[in-house]
């Protein structure tokens, strides 16, 4: 299964762990979209930054 992830909020003022989690997902700018395979690494990083991103499951 794949996930469509969109960065909805900026990283200004966020701690280092949240910035690294967003970068590891391949996101840099607000509004940027990536499509990734669902796996434990991706799910763990999404849990850390769920308030900054929008996630949609693709079939």
Swiss-Prot record:
CDD domains given in the database record: Ribosomal_L30
Coiled coil, from the record: none
Any one GO MF annotation of this record: structural constituent of ribosome
Signal peptide: none
GO terms under biological process: translation
Family: Belongs to the universal ribosomal protein uL30 family.
Stated name of the protein: Large ribosomal subunit protein uL30
């Amino acid at each position: 299964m794949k996930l469509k992830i969109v960065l909805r909020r900026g990283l200004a003022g966020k701690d280092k762990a949240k910035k690294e989690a967003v970068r590891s997902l391949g996101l840099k700018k607000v509004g940027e979209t990536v499509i990734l395979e669902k796996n434990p690494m991706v799910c763990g990083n999404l849990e850390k930054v769920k308030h900054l991103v929008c996630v949609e499951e693709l079939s």
